[in-house]
Swiss-Prot record:
Annotated source species: Cenarchaeum symbiosum (strain A)
Keyword flag Metal-binding: yes
Catalytic activity: Endonucleolytic cleavage to 5'-phosphooligonucleotide end-products
Binding site for Zn(2+) 3: 180, 227, 229
Annotated protein name in UniProt: Probable endonuclease 4
Function field: Endonuclease IV plays a role in DNA repair. It cleaves phosphodiester bonds at apurinic or apyrimidinic (AP) sites, generating a 3'-hydroxyl group and a 5'-terminal sugar phosphate.
Lineage of producing organism: Archaea, Nitrososphaerota, Candidatus Cenarchaeales, Candidatus Cenarchaeaceae, Candidatus Cenarchaeum
GO terms assigned for molecular function: deoxyribonuclease IV (phage-T4-induced) activity; DNA binding; DNA-(apurinic or apyrimidinic site) endonuclease activity; phosphoric diester hydrolase activity; zinc ion binding
Keyword Zinc included in the entry's annotation: yes
CDD domains according to UniProt: AP2Ec
Length: 280
């Protein structure tokens, strides 16, 4: 079972492996650089080598690791300047994943900025097709959104439609965020609701395309369109829904990453333990 959390790269990208080991991770996610800026410091061969050496020594399988895109890029942007910067960042992140030997890059689909879903998706597909030109084995993952205004990729049918336009198909997959799905309106809070939602995901996106699960509970209600993560099993989704998601991932060998708060209620270690217990 591959379970872990998002860990910091503060002090050097190899430190992320140390942070993952300290938390008992068998999977983990990182930002490869400062997520709040456009500029990225290059990863040297020595830095990449140290990261890969530590990862090998840690016994964490590379298949359980992923990089998350920075916050600023908007791949669905209809503003030419912003879109170009976003595409350049996407290409750069695919290259950085390749240097580190990390197989998955998690991407946000972005906002069409009021230009309409059709225009936004057109820009999004163009961005992904550009990134597919990078010659390495990195799989680019599309993460479902919580349904905020002007966002794309919240509804499973739309997510599946976008995915179906991308080639080569083997270069693309999906990262399902349980909090985002719940916030959009998929009621994961009961066993029956979770089954119905995952059946719909399978029909419209395909469980075979699910490569990483963001196992996050929700602070807000179902259909709220609010992206507010909460501790595993303690939020609005609750234990039944989190158990259904965790067991699905465990059964299919899909890495689970928690992106939950660290506060007086629980820390990363506590949420990883909760996820592991629910997965059985």
């Amino acid at each position: 079972m591959q379970v872990g959390c998002h860990v910091s790269i503060s002090g050097g990208i190899d430190r992320s492996v140390d942070n993952a080991v300290e938390r008992g991770c068998t999977a983990f996610q990182i930002f490869s650089r400062n997520p709040r800026g456009w500029r990225a410091k290059e990863i040297s061969k020595d830095e990449a080598g140290t990261f890969k050496k530590k990862l090998k020594e840690s016994k964490i399988e590379p298949s359980g690791t992923c990089v998350h895109m920075p916050y600023l890029p908007n791949l669905a942007s209809t503003n030419d300047e912003s879109h170009k910067k976003s595409v350049d960042t996407l290409i750069g992140e695919v290259e950085r994943c390749g240097l580190l030997g990390i197989p998955f890059l998690v991407t946000h689909l972005g906002s069409h900025l009021g230009a309409g879903e059709e225009k936004g998706i057109e820009r999004l597909v163009k961005a992904y097709k550009s990134a597919a030109g990078v010659k390495n084995g990195v799989t680019i993952l599309l993460e479902n959104t919580a349904g905020q205004k002007n966002s794309v990729g919240s509804e499973f049918g739309q997510l599946g439609s976008i995915l179906s336009q991308l080639r080569p198909a083997k270069r693309f997959g999906v990262c399902l965020d349980t909090c985002h799905a719940f916030a959009y309106g998929y009621d994961l809070s009961t066993r029956a609701g979770a089954k119905k939602s995952f059946d719909e995901f399978d029909k419209k996106v395909g469980l075979d395309n699910l490569r990483v699960l963001h196992l996050n509970d929700a602070k807000a209600g179902c259909g709220s369109k609010l992206d507010r993560h909460y501790h595993v099993g303690l939020g609005s989704i609750g234990k039944e829904g989190m158990r259904a998601a965790a067991r699905l991932a465990s059964k299919r060998g899909i890495p689970m990453v928690v992106e939950t708060p660290v506060d007086e209620t629980r820390d990363d270690v506590g949420n990883i333990k909760a996820a592991r217990a629910l997965a059985g």
